[in-house]
Amino acid sequence: ETEVTYVRAGKLYRVRSKGTILAGDNAMIPYICAELPEEQREALLLTDRAVNMMTTVSLRTWESFERLGITGVDSPGMFYNTFNLRTPRHFGAYRPRLDPAKPALVGLQSPSGVLHHRTMVRELFGGNPPVPGTPLREQLAALRTRVLRTLFEDFERRIRKQLARVLSPGGFDPARDIEAITINRWPHGFAMGTNALFDPAEWTGESHPAVVGRQRLGRITIANSDAAGLSLAQAAMDEGYRAATEL
């Protein structure tokens, strides 16, 4: 039997069950489950997440894209290294109208996480990014802070500038055509595996922190993509299945 204690609306509750699966951010588990062995606790605390960010812009029309004959742009030297029109969704018999005079959504992103895009990192750090050779975990921690501290207005200014620079030959006017901007900041974006450049060579096989950290503790099992060290939906599903079958 396991026992879970939680607070809701200022009241303390306690639930008993035959088993519990901890499937949140694995680095938080040592703070939730105090009974963990020290080796497992230390392994879970090594869990790290890559920083990611997804930006969506709502446009009045997408006529500028049509006039330019494009649906998206790769722009590695700009703040976002790619942006494109969101693919219209089909639901059952519903078919969206592909009318350039109608509103559309544009997604701006840096694939594989913010740290992989040098221009965005440099600008977020005010021209002074982490020096080459800085341990990956330190880079991620510093970048996390920068992403959270950057004002929405700073992102908005860069978005308007980038879209205008690329789309203005097609008649795009950011003041007229941008209806709304949504920025999803994921400072703890997605699970990471080990990195041979920075991590100990012995972190392989059964000694991998993800493997050590996901060991069953009585009637408690551990899941989430962190438990696989992979940022894949399939990995999260596999770990969830494993955790459930271990109970």
Q: Which positions does each model-derived feature cover?
A:
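Conserved flavin/dinucleotide-binding core of flavoenzymes
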Residues: 3-7, 58, 64-247
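Glycine-rich loop(s) and the adjacent beta-strand/alpha-helix scaffold that form part
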Residues: 2-75
